[in-house]
């Protein structure tokens, strides 16, 4: 069996990147160095893998779910001592043995596992990761990136926007048309870079946890005014005091509140709750 005889499996969300310009762009933004230990998720036919291995790096470790591709990939890169391959599902694979070595994560993400992948590699509010990733480069569904980068007042703004922007620096590199893939997906993709914030640059862990809860409650009822969503965690009296002392308009809807104001609101909620205990 060879790559030409391998048929993509729809259940794995396989859309292989075939646009050489985008492959080169991913390599360029990765800014690879000799010390880099790269984790590539879903190498597929190995087109991007080949580009990355052309650079001097310490190691490229790839994880591929499709068992039919394992022998093909091992054969393709059999002469490259910096390449290693593991068969498995990235959502359940134990990375403990290599996690502290990994410096960069690169992937063309299957659309159906975008959320869990972001949680694992970019991180979550209220959880300080022990990973050493300095750069995460993902090719993702465009509308997800639009939501992640949305600012207050934008209809795309949501809990994901606030969470992701609070734990990482994010750069949109370029949009990628369906024709860049085999087979072409139905939607555009976007190449995006996440640079996770170091622990010392993050908010206080207790504040992050409270803010995460506040975002979940608020955006679950995004059509409601903040005044009406807070009643599940604060009394009517507390909400009234908060609205009088806060710089936030409590008649605003969640998507209209800036990240800085979300932080101030969480701080104020914690303060008033502690005072009344």
Swiss-Prot record:
Specifically dimethylates two adjacent adenosines (A1518 and A1519) in the loop of a conserved hairpin near the 3'-end of 16S rRNA in the 30S particle. May play a critical role in biogenesis of 30S subunits. SMART domains: rADc. The lineage of its organism: Bacteria, Bacillati, Cyanobacteriota, Cyanophyceae, Synechococcales. Belongs to the class I-like SAM-binding methyltransferase superfamily. rRNA adenine N(6)-methyltransferase family. RsmA subfamily. Keywords: Cytoplasm, Methyltransferase, RNA-binding, rRNA processing, S-adenosyl-L-methionine, Transferase. S-adenosyl-L-methionine binds at residues 15, 17, 42, 64, 89, 108. It comes from Prochlorococcus marinus subsp. pastoris (strain CCMP1986 / NIES-2087 / MED4). It catalyses: adenosine(1518)/adenosine(1519) in 16S rRNA + 4 S-adenosyl-L-methionine = N(6)-dimethyladenosine(1518)/N(6)-dimethyladenosine(1519) in 16S rRNA + 4 S-adenosyl-L-homocysteine + 4 H(+). SUPFAM superfamilies: S-adenosyl-L-methionine-dependent methyltransferases. GO terms for cellular component: cytosol. Pfam families: RrnaAD. Its EC number is 2.1.1.182. This is Ribosomal RNA small subunit methyltransferase A. It is found in: Cytoplasm. It is an enzyme of class 2 (transferase). PANTHER family: DIMETHYLADENOSINE TRANSFERASE, DIMETHYLADENOSINE TRANSFERASE-RELATED. NCBIfam families: ksgA. InterPro entries: KsgA/Erm (IPR001737), rRNA_Ade_diMease-like_C (IPR023165), rRNA_Ade_Mease_Trfase_CS (IPR020596), rRNA_Ade_methylase_Trfase_N (IPR020598), rRNA_adenine_dimethylase (IPR011530), SAM-dependent_MTases_sf (IPR029063). Its main location: cytoplasm. One of its GO terms (molecular function) is 16S rRNA (adenine(1518)-N(6)/adenine(1519)-N(6))-dimethyltransferase activity. It comes from the Bacteria. CDD domains: AdoMet_MTases.
């Amino acid at each position: 069996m060879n790559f030409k005889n391998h048929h993509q499996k729809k259940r794995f969300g396989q859309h292989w990147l075939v646009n050489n310009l985008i492959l080169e762009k991913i390599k360029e933004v990765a800014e690879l160095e000799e010390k880099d230990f790269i984790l590539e998720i879903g190498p597929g036919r190995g087109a991007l893998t080949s580009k990355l291995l052309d650079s001097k790096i310490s190691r490229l470790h790839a994880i591929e779910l499709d068992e039919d591709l394992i022998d093909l990939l091992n054969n393709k890169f059999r002469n490259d001592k910096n390449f290693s391959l593991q068969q498995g599902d990235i959502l359940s694979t134990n990375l403990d043995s290599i996690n502290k070595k990994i410096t960069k994560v690169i992937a063309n993400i299957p659309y159906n596992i975008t959320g869990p992948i972001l949680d694992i590699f970019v991180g979550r509010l209220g959880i300080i990761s022990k990973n050493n990733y300095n750069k995460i480069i993902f090719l993702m569904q465009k509308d997800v990136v639009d939501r992640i980068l949305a600012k207050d007042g934008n209809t795309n703004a949501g809990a994901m926007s606030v969470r992701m922007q609070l734990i990482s620096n994010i750069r949109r590199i370029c949009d990628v048309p369906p024709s860049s893939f085999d087979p072409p997906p139905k939607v555009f993709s976007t190449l995006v870079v996440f640079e996770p914030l170091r622990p010392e640059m993050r908010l206080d862990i207790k504040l992050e946890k409270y803010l995460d809860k506040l975002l979940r409650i608020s955006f679950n009822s995004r059509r409601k005014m903040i005044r009406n969503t807070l009643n599940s965690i604060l009394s009517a009296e507390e909400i009234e005091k908060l609205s009088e002392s806060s710089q936030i308009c409590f008649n605003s809807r969640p998507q209209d509140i800036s990240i800085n104001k979300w932080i101030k609101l969480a701080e104020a909620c914690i303060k008033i709750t502690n005072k009344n205990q």
